[in-house]
Each structure stands twice: as structure tokens, then as C-alpha cells.
Swiss-Prot record:
It catalyses: RNA(n) + a ribonucleoside 5'-triphosphate = RNA(n+1) + diphosphate; a 3'-end ribonucleotidyl-ribonucleotide-RNA + H2O = a 3'-end ribonucleotide-RNA + a ribonucleoside 5'-phosphate + H(+). Two Mg(2+) ions are coordinated by both the catalytic residues and the nucleic acid substrate to enhance substrate recognition and catalytic efficiency. The gene is POLR2B. GO terms for cellular component: chromosome, telomeric region; mitochondrion; RNA polymerase II, core complex. This is DNA-directed RNA polymerase II subunit RPB2. It comes from Bos taurus. Keywords: DNA-directed RNA polymerase, Hydrolase, Magnesium, Metal-binding, Methylation, Nucleotidyltransferase, Nucleus, Phosphoprotein, RNA-directed RNA polymerase, Transcription, Transferase, Zinc, Zinc-finger.
Length: 1174
């Protein structure tokens, strides 16, 4: 790798990295990783794979469209009509483009798409070859170059995005934030993320024990062809439980049966083998039990052999299977043909769907039975459903490929239908008109916009929530949303197993960041250095194995399997090998040199089971580890020195991987390596814990995800506290992105004076938390001063708040567009006038300009009009001509939210996709911290503001420092957030020392003792306690108080957004009860439990007032004779009950309107509730 003279400069021992050096060196390695990969690389790579490979593959895989008209029998002799063949070939994708209404294309910039509610998508073109074959003439080929077939939404910052590869300066000129990571789509102006979906790995054999079922054990294999549109077909091989439901319990032991796709009943396993053409018992057993010297296993198979004794020929077996699958009443030949089809095409398609795959399928089926028997005999552990090696994650690539495949199929179907019409009339057809470009464009747009993943027509089968609106509250919440994983298990299931933190998640998934409540443990987040494979072709590996003396299944004698090692590639058994040790070494060497084998391929050698499994598929989660050989890191000082200079010498992370110093290890392979936690473990010790290390962690703090990496000293907190902070960190206010002033987000909170924390973790620099922080370093005292901070509330310094402490601004955008609803109904922006407009509200319309929009800088308050819009009323035919109507228009303006006030910040008028006038208005309001607002430290210690005291009323130290925030001492003991206290100490040291404190987890260099000693060097109390003086009296407070700087966050939950009360107001139409919810000025529900309390109190009048007078009072007239509601005309005072012919005996009854409604609904179902008045 290096020249000889270069090697000479570095003495071998001198080049080793010592543990002390590693403290800094590991962060250089990690920085190089993030410089190259960023935080959303897994999204971008997956999308690029889709665009560059999958789309072309899907188009090529589609069979050519073959069309021919029906033969015409008009002229006597039958002439063969011409055949038309359409083949789709090379595809082209252009850069994202927008066609204005006048038809001029222009490149579309992402920010323009956001502001104008466009979709950021690129046009897709394809070459089509059209061949016309007429009898007696030579065929005529026409090439249709670059035919437009639809638009594909483009992921921001991917290869085909216009922002790809631009410098920070260029990005700023395009109004884009250089820190924005990309990895999302823009659909109709809103940003959408594709959440990675978890699924079980396909083509792998699992064996599970069945509880409470007729089977004791089941082996399953979800078989699926690589890159194919066919759905997965699962095959189950099960062993019946002892003493099953069968009648003859004693006669036959535990039989083994298979459940085949499209076959209704289960089929005895031996019959399946005979149907595959393996007839003699010995042949079959050779494929199941490789070693005949194993009496236990032979016994297990005996019952199955006895059961299938009646069927000895292949055709009889096929007939047996066919009669259980085909429609009843078809001939024997048809049944046999059907069974052959099922066995060839539907059973284990990943082994092969062509002819002559019987041997391979028999071997694979035999392997499944073998695994089942091993599990039944207790020689091999059962598989674990929650093991992360058995899981795959579907990212943007596979998800979009699944969608595009369906859309493309529909497109071809439409082309065929369109062309057939013309051909049947004997005409030629126009290809451009035959292609409905809307199918692909709208199909992809629909799924990305709604999150229903699948065909729009079958919306109920589709998965929901795959695509979500990108969370833009804080920068951390955006990053975290782009790295989220979702398990599609029903949220209502109370299953604990899939929600638990599994051992295999170490380093792949963050242990702290998961939501609380019903989705806990089902929604996860990627750890910082985890990466998801995009998949590569297995063909080079298969060719390599052929060369390296792997014996193919077709060519071996079954006896050879017993002592050889089986080789699986992507779950498919491809052959056996006699020297696995050497083979694995060669494969590893190739992967480390990145020769033939891509670095993300994983190879597992299971020594005990004699198997080598190689995986190249997409969606495996993996992470980089340092390679150790002979107890020494392969990473040397020279690599570190080159990385330090990486701005100048272009030496990057990729070079580390290429030089075989670092490699990617996935969850399955991680179980076969020996991992050292730190290079310190590799040092020669008296008693070595292990002398066979193969890999070493880069840094243990990389097991955390985005939100947990912001927590200082998370290893000193009780674990649920870290989980709480991970959720709250997403609600903190800060600067969510640097171009917020040119964006029109529906909601946005921006803190006035955010500060970077005094106490940071090393991981923060990769999350850009220093550039875009979300909080303020506040002086925090822990005391119960005046007692206004009980129950998690905090006392705040009023003077600090007046100086701008935690002040924030809140932006809300309103949007509206003109449109034509019909030929006589059109909407226009204008200032409505009371003379011509119907339905104008009692609101102030004077603030509008003549164009119907409000001007920037105007102060607006609840229910003011911000966008004036009218819609023309349709003319009524029955009106006489000449009579001019009073109203010609109806008002449909947009009003400010009732509970908000603010200043109009920005008004934007433009044209949208359809060319209609379209406007967005942004209103800003200043939010000053007040009593009831929510704050939190970075340790899950949340609290609301209980009271604000002026600075002169706050306690002060002898140096004259007053705290900004006072929290209650009771918040600490039971919650055990020691990290909070250490952060405060470290912050005190940092403020004195003038440098940033390091609070990275699992860091032995920093501990409480060291921080305390530093603090006492500066003349403070060892543990941060100080003497405080009472602000009211000036006397010394008897106890010492813990005080120091702590980083606090302001959360988005503010009193102004929650305060709500109502006296009278709008009611629902159906039951005349008050509306629900603050936005509709609704009432407060007096529920069942409140009602029960009042009944227990015996407060009857109060109860009546709440549930009747204050809700929906109503009066009805009731006939005294039959008790049914009577007809009453209150104007003429005439009352009658038609049924009883009674006009006199009628009473007035008061009852809730909802009760009257119920009675009438019952009457409609011919149940008569009679109200007998007494």
C-alpha cells in the first residue's frame, strides 16, 4: 500500500496510537465520517439508488406491449392483421423543472417550490421502440426518443437536486440554508420525509415455537425475488404438536407438513419432495438429513414417511397437490399442470422460477425441514423475531421503487387499452397521446402527500403514515425526524416484546430516544454513526465463489454436505465449501480492499452450524468499527495525521475504508466479532480479559441518537429522564434554520438571544447545535425561596425577562388562492363592501388595501380580516331580468385566529401551479415569558414559571450574582438526575475558566472529583454551594445554596396558546350543544365523572344547571293521553295531537335538546318513548 521508503519513516512501535492519544484521535476519525456522510446520508443514498438503478430496472423488466387486431373475416380469405410491439428502453431524468402556464420551462429552485406550493420534481423521459410486423413485409421499426412519461419528486440535496454540490455562498444566494441537511421532498409546497419502515428480512429461514396451536414448531421463509414486482410468497414447514387433533393419536407420531402458496390445505412434506421428482425414500432423506448416522433425527422423520407411503410416483404427488389447489372438477392433466406451475413459480421463487430448479428447491426445502428438526431436538436455538439482524429497513429507495413499479404497470395497461382501440379500427395510434403522464406524476405525488403508501384506488390496503410533514420546530427535531424508524405493528397491541430494547440494537438505534405512550419502543431513531445499506448485486460474489472452489448444489452428492460448510447468499443456498476458514479470510480481505466486494456487504460464519451467510441486500443497518489485528489497531498515527490535514490533501473517511482500517459491520456480523470498547482494552495486561479482539469501537458515545447527544452527562441520569429530554429537546425554541426570514412556515418559533451551551458534548458539533442552539445559559439556584416553585414550577427573575431573557417571536402563516369553481363562480381578492357582499362578519375590514390584502407592518388582533376574498353568487334563473339583485357576491375572507394578536410581517403574492393568483401572509407576535410558560433543563426537568420577582427581590450572593431561575430542591432526589448537578458544577468551572466544558458520556477523563477540585482552585466551595442573602430582608440565608449556570430551554407550550374560557357562544347544529375546542370558541365538557361527583354531593340544582340550563335547554309540547310529542303552533296558540284527536290536554315539557333528538331517532326506528306527564 505504501512505498518502502515511506514505511521507513515510521518506526512500527512509534506509529501505534496510545490510549491517551486516542482521546483526541477518535474525534478526528468521527469528524471525518460526518464531514463526508452528514447526518442524512442514508436517505440520500437510498434515493440515488432508486433514481440511478431501480427506475431503469423496473422499466426494463416490464414485458413489451404486444398488440394485434382481431382477424377480420369480411373478404373471405383470412388475412393476418399487423402486430405492434412496444418496448421501453433507456430512461433519462432531467433536472427539476417547472413549466409556467405559458409553457416556458425553467429550472425550479426548492425555495420557490416551497413558497409557491409547487412540487419539486423532475421530468422522466424514456426511449420507446415501436415495431410493426406485417405478413409478407419486413418489419418496420420506429424509435421514439425521449418520450415524456411523468414527473418524479426529487429529494433535496440528492444527486439530481439543483442544490447538489453547491458551496455555502451559492446556497445563501438561492435563499437556502447551508446547514439544512436535505433528505426530504417538497410536495405542493410542504416538506415531506419518508420514515424508514421496519420489516422482517425476506429469503431467510426462521424457526419459531408455536404456543396453543396444533403445531409444535413452524419454520417459515418469506421468499421474494430481488428487484421484482411480485409480492412475497411465504412457505411454512410445520411440525404437528404431540397428540394433535388427529383421531389416530397413537398410530402416527409428529408429522411434518408444508403450507404452500395457493394451496388450500397443508401438504405432507414428503409428498412435496415426490412432486419435485425425488421419489425413493433414500433420496428424500439425503436432502433432509445429511448424516445417516443420526438415529434421533431419523426417528423424527419416520412418521412423515409412513404417512406418505401411499403416494409413490411424481405424477400422483402432483395430482394430490393440484387437487387441493385448482378449481374442483378440472381434469387430471390440468391439476398436474397447476401443481407444477405452483411448485415452479410460487414456491420459493428466490431459489429460481425457471425450469430445472427442482434440485435446488429440494435442497432448500430439505434445509428448512432440517432446521425444524434441529429445533425440535433442541440442538439449535429458536430464532428471535426481535433480533435486529432479522429486520430490514425500507428507506426512500425501496419504498419509491414499490410505488413506481405499480404506477408503471398501470401506465402500460392504459397504453395498451388506448392503442387497442385504434388498432381494432384499423388505424395507427399516436404514442405521445397513448401515454398518460398523469399516472406516474399524480400517483407518486398522492402517496407522498397523504402518506398512504400504495395505489390510490386501494387506499384501505395501503400503509398509512409512511410520509410525514417534516418537523421544523428546532434544528434537532428536523434532524431527528430525518433519522426516524417505524415498526408497522398495531399501536393498540399491548405486546411488550417488540417494544423492548433488544441487545442487538447497540450502536444501531438510540437507547433513549423513543416517544412516550402508545408508540413507545415502536418508533425508534438511528444512532449517530449507524448507516443503512442500499444494496448491491450479488453476481460478482457468486462468480468469485465459483472460482474459489465452491461446489454447486447440482453437482454434489448429498453425502458430502454433512461435513462441509453451507454457503448462503442473501438467504439462498448456493453451494458448499470444504475450507470455510480460508474462504472467510479471502472474502474479508477482498472487502477491506474494496475489490469485487462492496464495503457494505456482510459475511457471517456460523461455526457451530457450519454455515457461511453473505448478505448484499438493501436495508441492513450497519456501523463502522476499527479493525484490530494481532491485538493492535490497524489505524495508525499516520492516518490520523493525514486526516488532520484533510482540507488540503483530500484524504477522507472513504480512504480509511479503502485502506482497510475501518469497516462496516451489520447486526448479524457483529455477533461473530470480538469488540474492544476502547483501545485501552487492547493493551497488554497481566490478566488479559481477551486476547482475540477483532474490532474496536470508535467511541461508545456514538450509540446515542440525535436528541440524546445534546444531553450533558447522560450516563449520570436515570434512564427515563434521558428519554423525556429526548422528547422535550424537539420542542425547545431556538433558530430552527438560518433562512427562516424567507420561509413561510405555518408555525415557527424563534428565540431572540439563543446561546451555545457552556457545557457541551463532543457530538454536538456534528448536530450543529453550536451554530443553531435552542436555549440560554441561565444562573440557576436550587432553593425553595418563598415557595412559589412547588410542584415543578420555577421562580424567574423579572428584570432578566425585561432585558430579553427567553423572549421569543412566533410566526404564523395564512395562505389563500383565487380559483374558478365553475364558469359563473369565481373567487377574487378584493376589499368586500357591505353593499354588494352577502354574509360579511362583524369584523374590521378597514385594514385591507384595495387589492384585498393587508399591508406589512399593520397591527392585527383576533378576528381581524387579513385576506379579503369574495366569490360571485350564481345567477338564479327564476329571477326576472331587469330586477337587479342587492347582493352579487359572497364574502369568504380569511380572518386572524381568534386568540392571537400580532403584526403583519410579510405578504407574498404570486401565481400557483394552475396559474391562479395566490398569496401567503406571515404574522409575527412577540412572546415574553410569563407565568405558566414551560421551561426545561436538558435532563428531563421540566417546569412552568410560577412567579416572577424583580431583581431586588431575588436572593443574591456576596459577589452580587442573582439567579435567573430558582428551582425547587424536591425536583432532584426522587428523579436522580445527577447529570443536572454535574452540569451546573461544570458550567461554573467553564464560566470561570473561560472555556467550554466537556460533558461527553462514557468519558473517564471527566469526573465529579476533578471538576470539584478545579472549582475550589477558583476559590469557590468544592461542591458549588454558596451563601445567599435574602432579597427582601437582606439577611443571610441560614443554609448554603447550590447555584451555578445551567442550560435551560424554552418549550413551545405557552399559556397564550392554551388559555381558554367561554360564557355563551357557537353551538353544534345537530344536538345544539356547545362546540368543542379552543379554536371554535367551544365549551368545557362536564363529563361523566364530574356528574358522578355532583350526584354524590347531592347538589341537584347545580347538576341541573350544568347539564341542562347551561347546555341545550329546549321545550316540547306533549299529549297527556298518549305521551308523544304534539303539534304546537305558538303564534296562534293552537295545539293538537293528531293520533288522539286531542286539542286540550297538552302539557309543556322542558328537556335537553339531545334528549328530544334521541326520542325522535327512536321513533324513526318504531320505538315509541312515551312521556307521561303527572
Amino acid at each position: 500500500m505504501y512505498d518502502a521508503d515511506e514505511d521507513m519513516q515510521y518506526d512500527e512501535d512509534d506509529d501505534e496510537i496510545t490510549p491517551d492519544l486516542w482521546q483526541e484521535a477518535c474525534w478526528i476519525v468521527i469528524s471525518s465520517y460526518f464531514d463526508e456522510k452528514g447526518l442524512v446520508r442514508q436517505q440520500l443514498d437510498s434515493f440515488d439508488e432508486f433514481i440511478q438503478m431501480s427506475v431503469q430496472r423496473i422499466v426494463e423488466d416490464a414485458p413489451p406491449i404486444d398488440l394485434q387486431a382481431e382477424a377480420q373475416h369480411a373478404s373471405g380469405e383470412v388475412e393476418e392483421p399487423p402486430r405492434y410491439l412496444l418496448k421501453f428502453e433507456q430512461i433519462y431524468l432531467s433536472k427539476p423543472t417547472h413549466w409556467e402556464r405559458d409553457g416556458a420551462p425553467s429550472p425550479m429552485m426548492p425555495n420557490e417550490a416551497r413558497l409557491r406550493n409547487l412540487t419539486y420534481s423532475a421530468p422522466l423521459y424514456v426511449d420507446i421502440t415501436k415495431t410493426v410486423i406485417k405478413e409478407g413485409e419486413e418489419q418496420l421499426q420506429t424509435q421514439h426518443q425521449k418520450t415524456f412519461i411523468g414527473k418524479i419528486p426529487i429529494m433535496l440535496r440528492s444527486t439530481y437536486c439543483l442544490l447538489n454540490g453547491l458551496t455555502d455562498r451559492d446556497l445563501c444566494e438561492l435563499n437556502e440554508c447551508p446547514l439544512d441537511p436535505g433528505g426530504y421532498f417538497i410536495i405542493n409546497g410542504s416538506e415531506k420525509v419518508l420514515i424508514a419502515q421496519e420489516k422482517m428480512a425476506t429469503n431467510t429461514v426462521y424457526v419459531f415455537a408455536k404456543k396453543d396451536s396444533k403445531y409444535a414448531y413452524t419454520g417459515e421463509c418469506r421468499s421474494c425475488l430481488e428487484n421484482s414486482s411480485r409480492p412475497t410468497s411465504t412457505i411454512w414447514v410445520s411440525m404437528l404438536a404431540r397428540g394433535g387433533q388427529g383421531a389416530k393419536k397413537s398410530a402416527i407420531g409428529q408429522r411434518i407438513v408444508a403450507t404452500l402458496p395457493y394451496i388450500k390445505q397443508e401438504v405432507p412434506i414428503i409428498i412435496v419432495f415426490r412432486a419435485l421428482g425425488f421419489v425413493s425414500d433414500r433420496d428424500i432423506l439425503e436432502h433432509i438429513i445429511y448424516d445417516f448416522e443420526d438415529p434421533e433425527m431419523m426417528e423424527m422423520v419416520k412418521p412423515s414417511l409412513d404417512e406418505a407411503f401411499v403416494i409413490q410416483e411424481q405424477n400422483v404427488a402432483l395430482n394430490f397437490i393440484g387437487s387441493r389447489g385448482a378449481k374442483p372438477g378440472v381434469t387430471k392433466e390440468k391439476r398436474i399442470k397447476y401443481a407444477k406451475e405452483v411448485l415452479q413459480k410460487e414456491m420459493l421463487p428466490h431459489v429460481g422460477v425457471s425450469d430445472f430448479c427442482e434440485t435446488k428447491k429440494a435442497y432448500f426445502l430439505g434445509y428448512m425441514v432440517h432446521r425444524l428438526l434441529l429445533a425440535a431436538l433442541g440442538r439449535r436455538e429458536l430464532d428471535d423475531r426481535d433480533h435486529y439482524g432479522n429486520k430490514r429497513l425500507d428507506l426512500a429507495g425501496p419504498l419509491l421503487a414499490f410505488l413506481f413499479r405499480g404506477m408503471f404497470k398501470n401506465l402500460l395497461k392504459e397504453v395498451r387499452i388506448y392503442a387497442q382501440k385504434f388498432i381494432d379500427r384499423g388505424k395507427d395510434f399516436n404514442l405521445e397521446l397513448a401515454i398518460k403522464t398523469r399516472i406516474i406524476s399524480d400517483g407518486l405525488k398522492y402517496s407522498l402527500a397523504t402518506g398512504n403508501w400504495g395505489d390510490q384506488k386501494k387506499a384501505h390496503q395501503a400503509r398509512a403514515g409512511v410520509s410525514q410533514v417534516l418537523n421544523r420546530l428546532t434544528f434537532a427535531s428536523t434532524l431527528s425526524h430525518l433519522r426516524r424508524l417505524n415498526s408497522p405493528i398495531g399501536r393498540d397491541g399491548k405486546l411488550a416484546k417488540p417494544r423492548q430494547l433488544h441487545n442487538t440494537l447497540w450502536g444501531m438505534v438510540c437507547p433513549a430516544e423513543t416517544p412516550e405512550g402508545h408508540a413507545v419502543g415502536l418508533v425508534k431513531n438511528l444512532a449517530l454513526m449507524a448507516y443503512i445499506s442500499v444494496g448491491s448485486q450479488p453476481s460478482p460474489i457468486l462468480e468469485f465463489l465459483e472460482e474459489w472452489s465452491m461446489e454447486n448444489l447440482e453437482e454434489i452428492s448429498p453425502a458430502a454436505i454433512a461435513d462441509a460448510t453451507k454457503i448462503f447468499v442473501n438467504g439462498c443456498w448456493v453451494g458448499i465449501h470444504k475450507d470455510p476458514e480460508q474462504l472467510m479470510n479471502t472474502l474479508r480481505k477482498l472487502r477491506r480492499q474494496m475489490d469485487i466486494i462492496v464495503s457494505e456487504v456482510s459475511m457471517i460464519r456460523d461455526i457451530r452450524e457450519r454455515e457461511i451467510r453473505i448478505y448484499t441486500d438493501a436495508g441492513r443497518i450497519c456501523r463502522p468499527l476499527l479493525i484490530v489485528e494481532k491485538q493492535k489497531l490497524l489505524l495508525k498515527k499516520r492516518h490520523i495525521d493525514q486526516l488532520k490535514e484533510r482540507e488540503y490533501n483530500n484524504y477522507s473517511w472513504q480512504d480509511l475504508v479503502a485502506s482497510g482500517v475501518v469497516e462496516y459491520i451489520d447486526t448479524l456480523e457483529e455477533e461473530t466479532v470480538m469488540l474492544a470498547m476502547t483501545p485501552d482494552d487492547l493493551q497488554e495486561k497481566e490478566v488479559a480479559y481477551c486476547s482475540t479482539y477483532t474490532h474496536c469501537e470508535i467511541h461508545p458515545s456514538m450509540i446515542l441518537g440525535v436528541c440524546a447527544s445534546i444531553i450533558p452527562f447522560p450516563d449520570h441520569n436515570q434512564s427515563p429522564r434521558n428519554t423525556y429530554q429526548s422528547a422535550m429537546g424537539k420542542q425547545a425554541m431556538g433558530v430552527y434554520i438560518t433562512n427562516f426570514h424567507v420561509r413561510m412556515d405555518t408555525l415557527a418559533h424563534v428565540l431572540y438571544y439563543p446561546q451555545k451551551p457552556l457545557v457541551t458534548t463532543r457530538s454536538m458539533e456534528y448536530l450543529r447545535f453550536r451554530e443553531l442552539p435552542a436555549g440560554i445559559n441561565s444562573i440557576v439556584a436550587i432553593a425553595s425561596y418563598t415557595g412559589y416553585n412547588q410542584e415543578d414550577s420555577v421562580i424567574m427573575n423579572r428584570s432578566a425577562v425585561d432585558r430579553g431573557f427567553f423572549r421569543s417571536v412566533f410566526y404564523r402563516s395564512y395562505k389563500e388562492q383565487e380559483s374558478k369553481k365553475g364558469f359563473d363562480q369565481e373567487e377574487v381578492f378584493e376589499k368586500p363592501t357591505r353593499e354588494t357582499c352577502q354574509g360579511m362578519r362583524h369584523a374590521i375590514y378597514d385594514k385591507l388595501d384595495d387589492d384585498g390584502l393587508i399591508a406589512p407592518g399593520v397591527r392585527v388582533s383576533g378576528d381581524d380580516v387579513i385576506i379579503g376574498k369574495t366569490v360571485t353568487l350564481p345567477e338564479n334563473e327564476d329571477e326576472l331580468e331587469g330586477t337587479n339583485r342587492r347582493y352579487t357576491k359572497r364574502d369568504c375572507s380569511t380572518f386572524l385566529r381568534t386568540s392571537e394578536t400580532g403584526i403583519v410581517d410579510q405578504v407574498m403574492v404570486t401565481l400557483n401551479q394552475e396559474g391562479y393568483k395566490f398569496c401567503k401572509i406571515r404574522v409575527r407576535s412577540v412572546r415574553i415569558p410569563q407565568i405558566g410558560d414551560k421551561f426545561a433543563s436538558r435532563h428531563g426537568q421540566k417546569g412552568t414559571c410560577g412567579i416572577q420577582y424583580r431583581q431586588e427581590d431575588m436572593p443574591f450572593t456576596c459577589e452580587g450574582i442573582t439567579p435567573d431561575i430558582i428551582i425547587n430542591p424536591h425536583a432532584i432526589p426522587s428523579r436522580m438526575t445527577i447529570g443536572h448537578l454535574i452540569e451546573c458544577l461544570q458550567g461554573k468551572v467553564s464560566a470561570n475558566k473561560g472555556e467550554i466544558g466537556d460533558a461527553t458520556p462514557f468519558n473517564d477523563a471527566v469526573n465529579v472529583q476533578k471538576i470539584s477540585n478545579l472549582l475550589s482552585d477558583y476559590g469557590y466551595h468544592l461542591r458549588g454551594n454558596e451563601v445567599l442573602y435574602n432579597g427582601f430582608t437582606g439577611r443571610k440565608i441560614t443554609s448554603q445554596i447550590f447555584i451555578g449556570p445551567t442550560y435551560y430551554q424554552r418549550l413551545k407550550h405557552m399559556v397564550d396558546d392554551k388559555i381558554h374560557s367561554r360564557a355563551r357562544g357557537p353551538i353544534q347544529i345537530l344536538n345544539r350543544q356547545p362546540m368543542e375546542g379552543r379554536s371554535r370558541d367551544g365549551g368545557l365538557r362536564f363529563g361523566e365523572m364530574e356528574r358522578d361527583c355532583q350526584i354524590a354531593h347531592g347538589a341537584a340544582q347545580f347538576l341541573r344547571e350544568r347539564l341542562f340550563e347551561a347546555s341545550d335547554p329546549y321545550q316540547v309540547h306533549v299529549c297527556n293521553l298518549c305521551g308523544i310529542m304534539a303539534i304546537a303552533n305558538t303564534r296562534t296558540h293552537t295545539y293538537e295531537c293528531r293520533g288522539c284527536r286531542n286539542k286540550t290536554q297538552i302539557s309543556l315539557v322542558r328537556m335537553p335538546y339531545a334528549c328530544k333528538l334521541l326520542f325522535q331517532e327512536l321513533m324513526s326506528m318504531s320505538i315509541a318513548p312515551r312521556m307521561m306527564s303527572v
